[in-house]
């Protein structure tokens, strides 16, 4: 098991919180909750050791160059593909946009 932490600039805090996916479905669950203004923080707990570079590249593609709400994201991963990660994050952000 490996725990990874990432930070990106963000706008104002998001209002809602949500849980999408589960570790046994697509091998990934994502919890999104309001964070501190100006900061999007991500913590990944993964069963795949040595995957920090893959996660960093995925998050850079998603979060750099766009104003996201300030949230804390907790990801519990058991070997999900980048496509599943992106899908779950998009689902989560869509959910909090409706709260």
Swiss-Prot record:
Covalently binds the prosthetic group of malonate decarboxylase. Disulfide bonds: none annotated. GO terms for cellular component: cytoplasm. The keyword Cytoplasm applies. InterPro entries: Mal_deCO2ase/Cit_lyase_ACP (IPR023439), Malonate_deCO2ase_dsu (IPR009662). The modification O-(phosphoribosyl dephospho-coenzyme A)serine is found at residue 25. The keyword Zinc does not apply. Its main location: cytoplasm. It is found in: Cytoplasm. GO terms for molecular function: acyl carrier activity. It comes from the Bacteria. Keywords: Cytoplasm, Phosphoprotein. Subunit of malonate decarboxylase, it is an acyl carrier protein to which acetyl and malonyl thioester residues are bound via a 2'-(5''-phosphoribosyl)-3'-dephospho-CoA prosthetic group and turn over during the catalytic mechanism. Belongs to the MdcC family. This is Malonate decarboxylase acyl carrier protein. It comes from Pseudomonas putida (strain GB-1). The gene is mdcC.
